[in-house]
A protein has these predicted regions:
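Transmembrane beta-barrel wall of Gram-negative outer-membrane proteins
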Residues: 220-249, 254-303, 309-313, 346-361, ...
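Extracytoplasmic beta-strand/coil segments of soluble accessory domains associated
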Residues: 75-98, 114-159
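Short acidic/polar hinge/loop motifs at secondary-structure boundaries
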Residues: 159-185, 308
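Structural signature of Gram-negative outer-membrane beta-barrels, strongest in the C-terminal barrel
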Residues: 410-422, 448-587
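N-terminal periplasmic accessory domains that precede
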Residues: 113-116, 135-139, 152-156, 169-171, ...
Length: 796
């Protein structure tokens, strides 16, 4: 294909908190901040119970998008318990948190979730298996996984879009649909349960009252990219509804990378009575895409965009290949080495989510909420020598209560909740054979599984006085895994079938407490300290894959747990400046680490436990409006993650053991930064005209447990110019246009590098970087220079 186209928290937690055992801790919360602000905002004084008023209806609504102004010196109190309940998924008190408002991505080509989340410190993203499939990490939580999103919990308008097994996919996220995104950082299982070891993210669609009409937009640019999208919203009396729909297509910048995806996102709320609200949520995403093969580091340097890779026989240097059995079940009829385009590798998936929520106000000071979500993920994914095929329906129910009042003479907010979620499925792994369009051969394996989580959580927020606020919470959860793996082997030219059964039935019990203390001496400073815990159980599929990528017994996997300590501050000297800094230190036990398996293996990744590891780092964010119209923002993350107890066994005839204690955990970039300098004309005939220059920096990182091979880092520069104006028309409200150049200097860089396994010689010596650089199945290149323009019309 052508390339045309904390640190000073004056509030140390009591020593007793620091002595809590590693395997018994969790996390807590904060409060919603404006656009690109970070960490715990100020706590609001809780009002004494008052006579009920009709204001409950509006206060209970989800907050609108964050504005572009810095944090106010005095927070607005939450008028009702319903508002406090809504804030649980947006800004839980005491927890490092960032809200990215729509004004940060409304005037640029927001193609994927990465275009939003890079504005938050602590966040890193890498390309997954599809155009909008990104691996999102909070403090490096997901950097060791090869696809999808794990080790955090994701919500949309408060509805969970993470399935019970902990998997989330960003394919269904079109940034144009959202008004704000809340990033909650640090171990959070006390509040969000299983898999919230890194934190949580809540996407908020635009309120219907803000849309108040119809908007149509179109983005287009390099490599055949075209996004047509429509937004509609209206509030009439006690009812409001919003609808978003988009059709996105493109050729992709890597050979065999074309895509075609449609998304529908609907939200409606009906105030049946002054005390009762019913909300309905619907999301549907259809994805059809081709997928290139992940490369070795050497192949990346030779041919990053897979040019000249039509067939294996005529492939250019550096083309990725996959070996397919000619008969579709074994090697007796020979094999064929094919490129991704020749084999027809790709994905054809559907995701459907339906949710319903009922909220009832007993008074202004107490609200009860019940919520149910049906989430169905249907996949057909020939991504290599095999294709994963299956349907994964899940059910999620939660019921919670918030009450506001007094405790020991102090204003208090009490939160209690119970939850149950489950998923039951049968999925096949089928061999791909020559013939194009991912022709299927015989069944390689089948997994039948059940994954169930249920538990309780409680939380108390106490405003000790005007300066001090304390938070305590705990979550208790039971997780049940049941699975049966049937692996098929075929011998001889006729394929005589033998089967091997591996079963697993595991129960996990987890307790996750959290404690936080906030101190605000005056309107400029807020100091925070917190100890939180997280846990994440293995997935059923992890239990049946061994290090070679073959089907086998890996049922000894344990749940990972982490204990995290945060200390930080927010400094807001005036309305134009906000600086937030958080330092953290997290201790992991049995961390679940994933690495890529060789290309051609039935399974693309293998998961193991690292007995002990430590994660530490610093998150910083600056939002500085140094002159009218000008704005400078920075989001920076420093990460240092090491194994402290892990011995790796590597086989080559005999088995050799290597001590990895002290080594860096692979996949973790130590430094990441996004900085933007922008100007928007606020007055005069050019009002609405603006632009910005943006710099993204990602440091190099290790790809293997022995720390022998590094993926190179990169620096990218993006330029944007945009214009928005109101229209004097009976039918049109406004016109918005933009033009953006990304990767201005056309850097070739690594957008994704999955961890690779180390190898040894027959004598037990580890192979060096020169050998490891030939290990395939790891790297996707990032996009070269692109040009994108967009136009949006808002109708009355």
């Amino acid at each position: 294909m052508s390339r045309s186209t904390a640190l000073c928290g004056a509030v140390a937690l009591p020593c007793a908190l620091l002595a809590l055992p590693d395997n018994v801790l969790a996390q807590t919360a904060n409060r919603a901040l404006p656009p690109v602000t970070v960490d715990a905002p100020r706590t609001a004084e809780i009002r004494r119970p008052a006579k009920r008023t009709a204001s409950r209806q509006t206060a209970a609504r989800r907050p609108t998008q964050s504005t572009s102004t810095p944090a106010a010196t005095t927070p607005q109190p939450q008028a009702t318990a319903a508002a406090a309940l809504s804030s649980i998924h947006q800004s839980p008190t005491g927890q490092p948190q960032t809200t990215v408002g729509r004004e940060r991505f409304d005037n640029r080509p927001a193609f994927s979730v990465g275009d939003i989340l890079r504005e938050s410190p602590g966040i890193s993203v890498k390309q997954g298996n599809g155009p909008r499939d990104l691996g999102i990490s909070i403090r490096g939580s997901n950097a060791r996984n090869g696809f999808g999103i794990r080790n955090m919990v994701i919500f949309e308008d408060g509805f969970p879009v993470t399935q019970p097994d902990g998997l989330s996919r960003s394919d269904l996220i079109d940034p144009h649909a959202y008004g704000a995104v809340d990033v909650i950082r640090g171990p959070s299982s006390a509040l969000f349960g299983n898999y919230a070891t890194g934190g949580a993210i809540n996407f908020r669609t635009r309120p219907a009252s803000e849309i108040n009409g119809i908007e149509y937009g179109i983005d287009g640019g390099s490599f055949g990219y075209l996004n047509n999208y429509l937004t509609a919203g209206k509030k009439i009396g006690n009812f409001e509804a919003s609808l978003f729909a988009s059709d996105v297509r493109g050729d992709g910048y890597i050979s065999n990378g074309w895509f075609n995806t449609q998304t529908v996102n609907f939200l409606s709320t009906l105030h049946v009575t002054p005390d009762d609200r019913f909300t309905v949520k619907f999301i549907n995403n259809n994805l059809e895409t081709r997928l290139p093969i992940r490369l070795s580091l050497n192949q990346f340097h030779q041919n990053p965009f897979q040019e000249g890779c039509v067939t294996g026989a005529t492939a250019a240097l550096g083309c990725g290949r996959v070996t397919l059995n000619n008969n579709g079940f074994n090697t007796t009829a020979g094999t064929d080495s094919e490129t991704a385009e020749q084999a027809g590798l790709g994905r054809k998936d559907r995701r459907t989510i339906v949710g319903a929520r009922w909220e009832h106000d007993f008074s202004n000071q107490s609200t009860w909420r019940n919520q149910f979500v049906f989430d169905d993920r249907n996949i057909s994914q020939p991504t290599g020598s095999t294709s994963a095929i299956g349907d994964f329906p899940s059910y999620n129910y939660m019921s919670d209560f918030v009450g506001r009042g007094e405790m020991l003479g102090m204003s208090a907010t009490t939160y209690l909740g119970a939850f149950y979620n489950t998923m039951s499925w049968s999925s096949d792994t089928v061999q791909v054979k020559p013939g194009g369009n991912a022709t299927l051969g015989r069944l390689s394996s089948n997994v039948r599984g059940e994954h169930t989580n249920f538990g309780l959580r409680a939380r108390e927020e106490l405003q000790i006085n005007n300066a001090w606020t304390a938070v305590a919470g705990v979550g208790l959860e039971q997780t049940q895994l049941k699975g049966l793996n049937t692996a098929y082997t075929y011998t001889g030219p006729t394929g005589i079938t033998t089967t091997r059964l591996t079963s697993a039935e595991r129960d996990f019990q987890n307790i996750a407490p959290e404690l936080a203390l906030l101190y605000r001496p005056n309107g400029e400073w807020l100091f925070r300290s917190r100890v939180g815990t997280g846990y994440g159980t293995p997935q059923v599929g992890n239990l049946f894959v061994v290090s070679s990528g073959q089907n086998g017994n890996n049922t000894q996997l344990e749940a990972q747990t982490n204990v995290g300590y945060d200390v930080g501050f927010d400094w807001t000297p005036n309305n134009t400046t906000k600086l937030s800094v958080t330092g953290f230190y997290e201790f992991f036990r049995n961390e679940l680490v994933t690495q890529a398996t060789p290309v051609g293996a039935p399974n693309s990744s293998f998961t193991f436990n690292a007995p002990r590891s430590e994660h530490r780092g610093v998150e910083a964010a600056l939002d500085w409006r140094f002159h009218p119209g000008w704005r400078f923002t920075v989001a920076y993350t420093y990460l240092d993650q090491i194994y402290t107890n892990y011995a790796e066994d590597i086989a080559n005839g005999a088995v050799f053991r290597f001590d990895r204690a002290g080594n860096k955990i692979p996949g973790i970039s130590p430094n990441e930064l996004t900085a933007r300098l922008g100007y928007d004309e606020m007055f005069g005939p050019l009002k609405g005209l603006g632009g910005f220059v943006e710099v993204q920096w990602k440091d190099s990182f290790y790809m293997d447990n022995a720390n022998l091979l590094k993926a190179p880092g990169y620096e990218l520069v993006n330029l944007n110019v945009h214009y928005k104006t109101d229209l004097a028309s009976d039918y049109l409200k406004s016109l918005s246009v933009f033009f953006e150049v990304r990767n201005v200097f056309d850097k070739t860089y690594v957008a994704s590098a999955n961890n690779i396994g180390n190898t040894v010689t027959a004598a037990g010596l580890q192979n060096g970087a020169g050998i490891l650089a030939n290990t395939t199945g790891s790297i996707y290149a990032g996009s070269p220079r692109t040009f994108t323009a967009g136009l949006k019309l808002a109708f009355r």
